[in-house]
């Protein structure tokens, strides 16, 4: 019995240590959710403003720009996948990868060759383990992304998109860049603390809704400098802003998923502690009962032997 009690004590100590760790990780994830939500809210006014300006530019001018004009024939499509750098986040990364795989299969079915770009160690490890080619990958900022991180990713994607696919031989262009005719992004939308959904979106070319001028939504503008110069300056910023918004929302989703996973682990540790404590108490009671029985049995034996004398 003593050995069993000792083993159960060790298990209780281990469960308590695990509970402290998972509780701390839950609290850290909770604080990061709030910070990521603040980043999302802070980026919205700029995102709305740049979208309105670009919509006005595209609606009031007839300029062909690589980031605005759909290609007649899409031969290669770039796909940016956002995953996490660390584990212990439930199904966050695996769900994003599953959504990306569905998109890749759909692109192939449409006769488009996918070019994969990956953010996050989990996604990079997944594709490297399977010997799947990646055009570029980035790690180290999935939990706390900055606009500089988004700009670095955006520059790579914009370079590939503006290069386009010159021919069908599958080789890179003269500058070593594999051009693409279309850009997609797979990131996780933050719906609530309990719900995060990975979704694919088109990143380029920018989709502009044609609105009748009679609606009066977009007034007449005079652009200084020229509209073409404004487009050259603003469209890359628009792509970078879209990527940054996806990164911060994915960061909030990752933290929410990790918080949920760590809360579940903390609850499981609490249940283990209660279970082992009950088992230890039962073992101790059984040991005490056995000792009392042995003492009573010995006393009775002594009494019986004394009466015989």
From Swiss-Prot:
Coiled-coil region list: none
Keyword Transport: yes
Membrane topology: Peripheral membrane protein
Subcellular location, record wording: Cell membrane
GO biological processes: proton motive force-driven plasma membrane ATP synthesis
Record has Iron-sulfur as a keyword: no
A GO molecular function held by the record: proton-transporting ATP synthase activity, rotational mechanism
Entry superkingdom: Bacteria
Family: Belongs to the ATPase gamma chain family.
Record-linked HAMAP family: ATP_synth_gamma_bact
NCBIfam families: ATPsyn_F1gamma, PRK05621.1-2
The protein's name in its UniProt record: ATP synthase gamma chain
